[in-house]
Amino acid sequence: MSYSTKFKSHFYGPFRDVAKSSPKGFDRSSYQLPVADKKKAINSSINNAAQGANYLMVKPGMTSIDLIKDIKKETLLPTGAFQVSGEFASLQMLSKANFGNYIDLLRESLVVFKRAQSDFIITYGARDIAKYL
């Protein structure tokens, strides 16, 4: 599986903080894509497919949801989404601030991935949602 479309994103923050892997003087833009460049994102996935990837993934998933269908169409490969730490944390924070039920928010975010034709979803909420399936 290839992180074929990995954007430079602020939504990686919570994971980087916990893993103590925040860039210090290191620019990840050499391998992370600019968020606004849809064409570059799709071309990155096409290149990964040409190099032998058998599954493709967009990351962060929620902010890349518009790409899933296009990548599948261009590559004919199963394409999924990774709901990264910041996206997952935002659902938890909404719930803690009484802006919604955590499971309902999580379920909605996952249903939208499926509606966007995601073949698989990676989420930090997998254990939580599994209790409700």
Located regions from the model:
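Alpha/beta enzyme core
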Residues: 1-133
